[in-house]
């Protein structure tokens, strides 16, 4: 497999890539880094919202208007929900609680909780759960939260939002709404059953919560939301004909009535060109063609939500549009801009800015409330409006009366500062010297569009062809699916000593940064395409020991919690696994490079780890 991938780096061949027949668990769309990572979780691109890999919505709508008829080909019009009873991230709440098992009926309104303590929510391990306001690290907790509701909610759609680590059972006025079993998740939504909505009353209500902390982190938080009027403007969908995942791009084909539409999401992650690989701009290419021989009037509508630049949808965002050079830009970001202000697992970026851009010729744009934007597009004149900090971005490409037309959008993110490395904030690799702007990156991406797309097509064809020869068709399709995912699971930055740092983010484990046992299974890809990136997977672990910041005689597990690389935060060491991983990867680097220079540079610490393994390797503590 490695040999097949390696030869794909060679001179481009004039080969048309065969379509992948794989039905992927999720389809990669915009792949830049662990934060700007957008996927389709559904078979058809229009069957559900575009999402971040954590499962939270990255709203992105795509609609074709053909001779006045609407066809939605991407995303869905998202549910708009208003806070009714706030979570700890939306406002302050207090409750009675106990960590000792109460008598039966504790979830009912008439239960006497006078002997229980009072605390502020959320409840959890405050050292590693930023929303926890009351320390709870014991095995169990029972909580009774009184909530005042002013509105009559009969007949409304009401949702419970909850975060839990681990098992949680939640009642609303004595009606069980959620029983999670053994799991730990954040910002989940559960629609209240009719019985629970019927039990809601104007005045005082009771939310009763049980949570079991099985191990490590603990957290419990919840609130209620009510659905706004959710009129749908784009009910008719296109018909998806195919989807095809290649290494650099994901291709879709649709029929929109008398017009066929092709879409390609491209992230040019070429590991032999680090400036291009880290350029934080992906392409969305469209191609329309009449399927009945006649000309048709075609407009394409693209709408992105502020969630691309927010951790939580209730955060306040600021949106704007502007032109620079030949590009029209739309931009959104959080109002607060706390750079590197959040760390953790199920967390998205809320500093920096998301951009959507296109050629300013035949483009129009607007920002504002989603329904207003959509209706104005249907009515033929895109119109801006204002919201309370949740403006959406809308971009329309007018293709005119045509039999065939094509073009592209640019989607990107400027994270300003990417990683904190032992107290120092580091810029992204593409702006490592602080002399680049995001607009210059977009301008380069636009100018180089044709050349980059040709290069991507050649790479995709070669990878699929040669991986098929080595491992068969299904193996090749897996290689193509894994390619962008594996690279974009990392962030590349330059250390103060000019070392490359290629830092991974753990997902749905604990959010660690630069974890050795995450590095180990992904390393073959980087050893094949650029051994300097393989070193970038190890440099921080060597530095951590060689600097004396980590003084144990074995390799660390990680260097922090993403994106803060200030030292190991994982609770347990894994000395045998991590030391063995580092030794094997260093040896593999020597084999690929044909010399042991990298090992020589780190010989002292490698010797320390080897001595540890010689003494304890066959009899590990744990």
Q: What spans do the regions from the language model cover?
A:
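An acidic-aromatic loop/edge-strand motif
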Residues: 83-103, 108-111, 116-118, 183, ...
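Carboxylate/His-rich catalytic cores and anion/metal-binding grooves
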Residues: 49-81, 229-239, 519-560
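Structural helix-adjacent loops and short alpha-helical linkers that scaffold large soluble proteins
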Residues: 44-47, 71, 293-297, 419, ...
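Aromatic-lined ligand-binding clefts that engage carbohydrates, nucleic acids, or primary amines
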Residues: 116, 139, 147-174, 207-209
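Short beta-strands within extracellular/lumenal beta-sheet-rich domains
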Residues: 136-150, 189-192, 249-252, 393
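Well-ordered alpha-helical scaffold segments within catalytic/enzyme domains
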Residues: 37-42, 62, 66, 254, ...
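Acidic/polar, glycine-enriched structural segments that form the non-catalytic walls/loops
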Residues: 5-7, 12-28, 37-38, 43, ...
């Amino acid at each position: 497999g490695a040999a097949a991938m390696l030869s794909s780096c060679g001179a481009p061949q004039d080969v048309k890539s065969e379509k992948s027949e794989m039905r992927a668990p999720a389809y990669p769309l915009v792949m830049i880094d662990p934060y700007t990572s957008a996927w389709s979780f559904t078979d058809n691109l229009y069957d559900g919202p575009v999402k971040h890999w954590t499962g939270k919505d990255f709203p992105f709508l795509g609609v074709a208007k053909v001779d006045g008829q609407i066809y939605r080909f991407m995303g869905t019009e998202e549910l708009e929900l208003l806070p009714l009873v706030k979570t700890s991230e939306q406002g302050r709440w207090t409750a009675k609680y106990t960590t000792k098992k109460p008598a039966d009926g504790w979830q009912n309104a008439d239960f006497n909780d006078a002997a229980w303590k009072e605390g502020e929510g959320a409840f959890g391990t405050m050292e590693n759960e930023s929303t926890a306001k009351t320390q709870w690290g014991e095995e169990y907790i029972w909580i009774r939260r009184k909530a005042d509701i002013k509105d009559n909610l009969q007949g409304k759609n009401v949702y419970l939002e909850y975060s839990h680590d681990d098992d949680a059972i939640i009642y609303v006025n004595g009606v069980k709404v959620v029983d999670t079993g053994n799991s730990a998740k954040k910002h989940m939504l559960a629609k209240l059953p009719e019985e629970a909505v019927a039990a809601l009353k104007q005045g005082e209500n009771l939310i009763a919560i049980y949570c079991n902390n099985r191990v490590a982190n603990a957290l419990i938080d919840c609130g209620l939301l009510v659905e706004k009027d959710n009129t749908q403007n784009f009910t008719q969908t296109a018909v998806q004909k195919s989807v095809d995942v290649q290494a650099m791009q994901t291709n879709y084909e649709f029929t929109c009535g008398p017009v066929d539409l092709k879409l390609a999401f491209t992230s040019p992650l070429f590991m032999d060109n680090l400036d291009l690989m880290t350029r934080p701009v992906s392409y969305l290419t469209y191609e329309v063609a009449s399927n009945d021989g006649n000309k048709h009037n075609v407009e394409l509508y693209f709408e992105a939500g502020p969630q691309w630049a927010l951790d939580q949808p209730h955060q306040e965002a600021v949106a704007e549009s502007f032109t620079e050079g030949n590009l029209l830009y739309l931009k959104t970001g959080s109002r607060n801009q706390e750079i590197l202000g959040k760390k953790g697992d199920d967390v998205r970026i809320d500093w920096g800015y998301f951009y959507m851009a296109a050629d300013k010729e035949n483009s129009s744009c607007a920002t504002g409330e989603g329904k207003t934007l959509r209706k104005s597009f249907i009515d033929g004149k895109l119109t801006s409006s204002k919201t309370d900090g949740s403006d959406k971005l809308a971009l329309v490409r007018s293709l005119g009366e045509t039999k065939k037309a094509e073009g592209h959008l640019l989607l990107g993110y400027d994270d300003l500062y990417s990683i904190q490395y032992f107290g120092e904030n580091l810029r992204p690799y593409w702006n490592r010297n602080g002399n680049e702007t995001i607009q210059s990156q977009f301008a380069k991406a636009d100018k180089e569009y044709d050349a980059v797309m040709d290069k991507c097509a050649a790479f995709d064809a070669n990878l699929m062809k040669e991986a098929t020869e080595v491992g068969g068709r299904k193996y090749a399709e897996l290689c193509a699916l894994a390619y962008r995912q594996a690279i974009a699971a990392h962030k590349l930055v330059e250390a103060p000593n000019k070392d490359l740092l290629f830092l991974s983010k753990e997902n749905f484990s604990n959010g660690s940064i630069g974890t050795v046992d995450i590095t180990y299974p992904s390393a073959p890809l980087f050893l094949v395409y650029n051994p300097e990136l393989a070193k970038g997977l190890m440099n921080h672990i060597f530095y951590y020991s060689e600097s004396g910041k980590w003084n144990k005689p074995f390799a660390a597990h990680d260097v922090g919690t993403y994106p803060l690389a200030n030292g190991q935060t994982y609770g347990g060491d894994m000395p045998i696994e991590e030391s063995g991983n580092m030794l094997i990867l260093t040896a593999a680097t020597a084999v690929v490079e044909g010399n042991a220079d990298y090992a020589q540079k780190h010989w002292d610490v490698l010797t320390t780890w080897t001595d540890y393994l010689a003494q304890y390797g066959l009899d590990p503590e744990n």
